[in-house]
UniProtKB/Swiss-Prot annotation:
GO terms for biological process: response to hydroperoxide. InterPro entries: YaaA (IPR005583). One of its GO terms (cellular component) is cytosol. HAMAP family: UPF0246. Belongs to the UPF0246 family. PANTHER family: PEROXIDE STRESS RESISTANCE PROTEIN YAAA, PEROXIDE STRESS RESPONSE PROTEIN YAAA. This is UPF0246 protein VF_2109.
Length: 259
């Protein structure tokens, strides 16, 4: 079973790491090509393109300039411990055991606008480049055109290597659009998380993101190997709703959270 998640905008390069192990990303030369395109942008261009503040734009102009094709523990850190958004709050990677980190290294992948696809222990230099960014590049006018079938082909290799025919999609729509379902040699299962608010169950972004991380953690800790076992997910009060689920979409609900 292979899991894909989105990356995060918030990064952490300060917290002590729970492991000294690391690996290298698979698409460094492709990332370098994107960096080359990014270096043509001024901070003003970046602010407009990414819809970010001047401060964040300036920070990322510096990051693009300092980015190197040599990844070391001095200029990078394993991706799983560098991302700090809502998904990663739920995943809580720093509390995983060594054997759980090893399992994640085989079964968890992070989609990325700059790096394409990252393994948990892949060294990652800090960046901001969301998959939906309309960045002109040598392969097209956006990152979906840039990555083409590369990410899907890599996922197929990973699935074949572990003898799995199931991909669990815990990524956002923006990121999963970088995967080509028709070319993927696996069944795609997408968990959906709905929270009750004012008597209605709906997808609430903040809760849904955290729930995706909780589900990834649940799979890693329990070494889940089939879809049936996913249905027993019950972290933070979520429960499986058979009547609203299909073979490809698993619906989980949760009662209203006290404020």
């Amino acid at each position: 079973m292979l899991i894909v998640v989105s990356p995060a905008k918030t990064l952490d390069y300060e917290t002590p790491l729970p492991t000294s192990a690391f690996t290298q990303p698979d698409f460094i030369s492709d990332s370098a090509e994107l960096i080359k395109a990014c270096r043509t942008l001024t901070p003003v261009d970046i602010a407009k393109l990414m819809k970010v503040s001047d401060k964040i734009a300036s920070l990322n102009a510096v990051r693009f300039e300092e980015w190197s094709t040599t990844f070391t523990q001095e200029n990078a850190r394993p991706a799983l411990f560098a991302f700090k958004g809502d998904v990663y709050t739920g995943l809580d990677a720093n509390s995983l055991s060594e054997s759980e980190i090893e399992y994640a290294q085989t079964n968890l992948r992070m989609l990325s606008g700059l790096y394409g696809l990252l393994k948990p222990l892949d060294l990652m230099q800090p960046y901001r480049l969301e998959m939906g960014t309309k960045l002109e590049n040598g392969r097209g006018s956006n990152l979906y055109q840039f990555w083409g079938s590369l990410i899907t082909n890599k996922l197929n290799q990973e699935l074949e290597a572990q003898g799995s025919e199931t991909l669990v999609n815990l990524a956002s729509n923006e990121y999963f659009k970088s995967v080509k379902p028709k070319e993927l040699k696996a069944d795609i299962v997408t968990p959906v998380f709905k929270d009750c608010k004012n008597g209605q169950y709906k997808i609430i972004s903040f809760y849904a993101k955290k729930a995706r991380g909780l589900m990834a953690r649940f799979i890693i800790q329990n070494k889940i190997s089939n879809v049936e076992e996913l249905k027993s997910f019950d972290s933070d009060g979520y429960y499986f709703v058979e009547a609203e689920s299909t073979a490809t979409t698993l619906v989980f609900k949760r009662e209203e959270q006290n404020k």
